[in-house]
Amino acid sequence: MTRRKKMVERVTELMDKPDRIRNIGIVAHIDHGKTTLSDNLLAGAGMISEELAGRQLFMDSDEEEQARGITIDASNVSMVHTYGGEEYLINMIDTPGHVDFGGDVTRAMRAVDGAVVVVDAVEGTMPQTETVLRQALKEGVRPVLFINKVDRLVNELKVDEQEMQIRLAKVIDKVNKLIKGMNEKMYNDGWKLDAAKGTVAFGSALYNWAVSVPFMKSSGVSFKDVFEKCNAGDMKWLSKNSPLHAVLLDMVVKHLPNPLQAQDRRIHIIWHGDYNTPEGKAMVACDPNGPVCMMVTDISFDPHAGEVATGRLFSGTLRRGTECYIIGAAKRANRLAQVGIFMGAERIEVEALPAGNIAAVTGLKDAIVGSTVTSLIEMTPFESLKHYSEPVMTVAVEAKSMKDLPKLVEVLRQIAKEDPTVQVSINEETGEHLISGMGELHLEIITGRIKRDKGVDILTSPPIVVYRETITGSVGPVEGKSPNRHNRFYIELEPMDPAIVKMILDGEISMNQQAIERRDALVAAGMDKDEAKNVKAIEATNMFIDMTKGIQYLNETMELVLDGWREALRGGPLADELVQNLKIRLVDVKLHEDAIHRGPAQVIPAVRSAVKAGVLMAGDSLLEPIQKIQITVPSEQMGAATSQIQGRRGQVFDMLSEGDTMTIVGKAPVAELFGFAGDIRSATEGRAMWSTEFAGFELVPAGIVNDVVKDIRKRKGLKEQIPRPDDYLA
């Protein structure tokens, strides 16, 4: 029997035993060694040959990933590990570390219950370490720590044995500080990392060895051995006497929760329905006999089988032919064609897959990433996936030849389905297709894939920055009249309270919640009680509140009112960019009694023009995306590095020195960061390590805002003159 076939048999035997399953993600800052670690774990479990591990990049199955040497998508694989004489099924997802692919990390964290956080012993915690850790804790995913590249401390920094231990302890302290700062309750509930308890391991993924305190006690390998063997370059001895996969997977099995333990805690974080319903009880208990409840965390395209939806199954059992509904899509049943699990790029079919596993299924035509899939016709959907960064750059793409246009439209639809951090839209005026993404690299990869995988030749524009609009003052009531003059809507506008905006972004307030729960959360955040109980809709970080009382026909017209409001948010009056942080109160309405005179063609334009006019009256302002920058350089290069930030309308707000290196933390607008990579390299003679991460939107400075608005309007083919409120209300 082949090694692979044997592995598949062992995997399928363990699927029905949730207490023997561990769903884990491997997360880290870029280049801290996640994929090398994943490969060596697979080799240890007998999935790929040991010689190739670490160089095979089994998890990086995409050509682009292998060529660039970075992970772009999250990859799944199932394997078996023996611990204490028992076999355990480990479903592992390797995630990208580059800031532009943070969306993949968010999605992976929904599917898993535990995370191995990988940190480079020399570089320590970096911005992306912080981001991935925050995402894990937010999803209720328990972390353990692997400090990688320990050999570099000895061979490159030439530290002695005592200094090595001090440095490793510092990394643990830093990660614990992050956990405590992000969620003190979890930290106090035993999520604090502790080398003595075995929730931390040290080693080298590349050279295939690791140690942990419990392993040292049982095997007799000591820190002294580690130091001496690293010093002598004898990695073979270390990998033979303390193999990476044994130490790490032992830690995973012993300290990370199984689906039964995890779901009891996590369901309350990721699902806000009624816990006394059949689906609520089944998910908390991880019950294979309950209704099917699955959350789609990834969609990929298989040339033979079509769309493959991967996701975490929280209750029920999936079989071929199972009829499922996708909440929020058309009310038609999708029949599962194939049910399976992933082994790297390969999909292995299975007869049945019970709750607690990560499933790969075909046949869910209506699903997108983030969909709730269930055998019930109706259920409260899972909380939507909250991404920590937002699209900050856009490129326009067009097909080189007209005959490829239908194919391009289809490919863009597919990309929007596969990667929810990408926004695809069509510029109605020019007919261009616009793709918005997380950064230059993200857009480069997407446009490259359109050409390579999908075979469509395209032309792309240089990247453009994504702006937003918001208001700085309050105004109202503003009157919006329908074209036939028979319907009138009166609205008041004011900026959203920043505390409530944060709660919306963190997923603590949403329209999926029970109304009472939402009202109480808003009142606790300082909102007026009457407003809090009349929230009709939340769109991005905008809120619509109905403060009217007993107006005839309004109930049946409300959906059209909200459509008009949403249309106005899609393009503000200043630069036709998305509007954010806007609170609108509907305070009075006069409607024609005849339904034919208050249809969509009357109501939608009336509300839309009132909102746009109100936004102008309340001080419409332009916001630009900002990135946090962290640069680590030798001390003598500090001046060159800080001037790179300050010369780009940036600010430096922290400088930390450790030994002879300096870490500079600052922020700068995305618009000024084009070409930053090349400039920082040449300014510091290639000795800088840097990383960026999304840090929200800020007002464009008054001195340049008019020029920026003019440029955007010109690019979009809009009139140069900014409209006045009367243009909308006339």
UniProtKB/Swiss-Prot annotation:
Major place of residence: cytoplasm
Keyword Cell inner membrane: no
Compartments, as annotated in UniProt: Cytoplasm
Keywords carried by this UniProt record: Cytoplasm, Elongation factor, GTP-binding, Nucleotide-binding, Protein biosynthesis
Gene Ontology CC terms, in alphabetical order: cytosol; ribonucleoprotein complex
Residue span, tr-type G domain: 19-260
GO MF, one annotated term: GTPase activity
SMART domains: EFG_C (SM00838), EFG_IV (SM00889)
Residue numbers binding GTP: 28-35, 94-98, 148-151
Keyword GTP-binding in record: yes
PTM annotation (Diphthamide): residues: 597
One Pfam family from the record: GTP_EFTU
InterPro entries found in the cross-reference section: EFG_II, EFG_III/V, EFG_V-like, EFTu-like_2, G_TR_CS, P-loop_NTPase, Ribosomal_Su5_D2-typ_SF, Ribsml_uS5_D2-typ_fold_subgr
Family matches, as PANTHER family: ELONGATION FACTOR-LIKE GTPASE 1, TRANSLATION ELONGATION FACTOR-RELATED
Protein family: Belongs to the TRAFAC class translation factor GTPase superfamily. Classic translation factor GTPase family. EF-G/EF-2 subfamily.
Function: Catalyzes the GTP-dependent ribosomal translocation step during translation elongation. During this step, the ribosome changes from the pre-translocational (PRE) to the post-translocational (POST) state as the newly formed A-site-bound peptidyl-tRNA and P-site-bound deacylated tRNA move to the P and E sites, respectively. Catalyzes the coordinated movement of the two tRNA molecules, the mRNA and conformational changes in the ribosome.
Designated name of the protein: Elongation factor 2
